[in-house]
Structure formats: C-alpha cells, structure tokens
Design a protein with these regions (language model features):
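A glycine- and small-aliphatic-rich helix-loop capping segment at beta-alpha/alpha-beta transitions
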Residues: 46-57, 80, 142-151
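Class I SAM-dependent methyltransferase SAM-binding "motif I" and its flanking Rossmann-like core
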Residues: 138-182
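Glycine-rich phosphate-binding loop
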Residues: 122-147
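Ligand-binding beta-strand-loop-alpha-helix segment within the catalytic cores
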Residues: 56-127
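Short beta-strand segments
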Residues: 33-37, 65, 102, 128-131, ...
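ATP/nucleoside-binding phosphotransfer catalytic cores, i.e., glycine-rich phosphate-binding loops
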Residues: 183, 187-243
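Glycine-rich N-terminal segment of FAD-binding domains in flavoprotein oxidoreductases
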Residues: 26-52
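N-terminal glycine-/serine-/threonine-rich phosphate-binding loop
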Residues: 1-32, 109
C-alpha cells in the first residue's frame, strides 16, 4: 500500500487525478470504478479541467459506481447517479451510455442482479474510494463479516448521521443502499483512496494499525497488490503518521 501525503487538498486532487489521467491516456477504453461523497469532488473537477484544456479524452471510457441509495430515482438530487452527472459526467466527453450506477427504484432483486452482472463483466482498472468515519468502504458497513458481492445493506446510524448533511433532514436519508461487495472492490487492478481530514479514526486503523478488521472495512486495503492512499499533511500530523 502506497501512502501519498500531500500539503493540501488541491495538491492531493492533482496527484490523484494523475493516476486516472495516465490510465485513460494509456488505455482509452479503460473501465473506471467511481465513488461519490465529498472526498473525490476536487479530483473530478481537475479531471474535467484536463478534459477541457489538456485533451484528456473520456469518449471511449466506461465506468461503474460503487453504490446507490435504494428508493431514490436517478433524477433525485441526492441520488448517486445525479451526483456523478453533476460533478463529473456533465463536464467531460464521456458517453453516459457507458456509465453505470445501480438503479435505486424498481424491483430491488432485479436491480441487484443487474448490478452484480455489470460488475462481474467489468474489468475495473482503477477503483476510486472514499472512506466513512467508521472505516466503511462504499456501503460495506462494519460488522463481523463482509460480503464478497454486491448486496443491499442496511445503513448504520453513524452513516445515516454523516450523510444527513446532504438532505433536508435526517428523516429523509434512505436507510438502505446497494453496494459493491468487498471482494469486487478488491478485484480492481488499482485502488485509489482519498481520505479527508475528518476521518481520523479510520486513518489510524488503516495507516497505524496492523489488523485486517471487518469492523473497520478499509483496513482490507492493506491486502491489495496496488493500493494508493492520498491524504493531506494535516491529517497525517493529527494521527502521527510519519511514513
């Protein structure tokens, strides 16, 4: 696992974007695994800038997203399909027919089967990841066991509370979500995690601890053959990480 400590969020976003930039230029038909949340937004803006100003071409790129709320249509402003359109897809020359975010409405079982089929038929080159305050990856919540494949997850109260800032009230936050399984995440060729400054406990477990702990799913990144963790110096200093 490679840890890249950056002086600030701007530098972090540029360095993280470099990985995707290099992959897309080398393999124009690559499949990217994408994530939502506040952590990757700056990186997405940098990729959009490079598409507009530096000829970074997404026209043949495919993508599959980690997760989606159950019960929200793609037109809902808090759905992850809407997030991806608003923060990336509308600003680059990607063909949206080549992008996949699980369906939040309709028959849940059918939607889940389709999600697993798409993942299993995708050869993800780089999987973008954020991390929850409790160390969850996508919506793989802490617990005694972790799932290999995509499934419908009941969200922990801490996750609901963390995501409430995006909704009018905490009561509006969906209680379930479709999420890519941990095994599917780990099968990506490269993992790219952006760890924001308020994730101190998860950072301690991942960067300072020795355990692979299902109660802190992000620790399983230690097993991956090509994983990158990007964080700011402020967070590294907070937890005492010196490399």
């Amino acid at each position: 696992m490679k840890v890249i400590v950056c002086k600030d969020y701007e530098e972090l976003c540029k360095k993280a974007a470099d990985l995707i930039d290099n992959e897309v230029r080398a393999n124009p038909e690559t499949t990217l695994g994408l994530a939502t949340g506040s952590s990757p937004v700056g990186m997405y803006k940098e990729l959009a800038r490079r598409c507009s100003e530096e000829g970074l071409d997404f026209s043949k790129v495919h993508s599959v997203n980690l997760d989606e709320y159950v019960g929200l249509p793609g037109t809902h402003d808090q759905s992850y399909r809407y997030f991806m359109d608003d923060n990336l897809f509308n600003h680059i020359n990607i063909d949206k027919a080549n992008t996949y975010v699980a369906k939040g409405i309709g028959d849940p079982e059918q939607n889940l089967r389709e999600f697993n089929e798409v993942i299993d038929n995708s050869d993800v080159s780089i999987q973008v990841l954020g991390v929850g305050p409790d160390g969850h990856l996508a919506f793989n919540e802490p617990g005694d066991t972790l799932w290999d494949k995509a499934h419908m997850e009941t969200l922990d109260q801490s996750t609901i509370e963390a995501n409430a800032r995006f909704f009018a009230s905490i009561d509006d936050v969906p209680r379930t979500a479709f999420t890519m399984g941990m095994g599917q995440i780990m099968r990506a060729r490269t993992l790219l995690m952006i760890m924001s400054n308020n994730k101190e406990e998860a950072a301690k477990q991942l960067l300072l601890g020795d355990k692979l702990d299902p109660h802190c799913p992000c620790t399983f990144m230690k097993m991956h053959r090509d994983a990158y963790v990007f964080l700011e110096k402020e967070l590294a200093d907070k937890i005492g990480y010196v490399g």
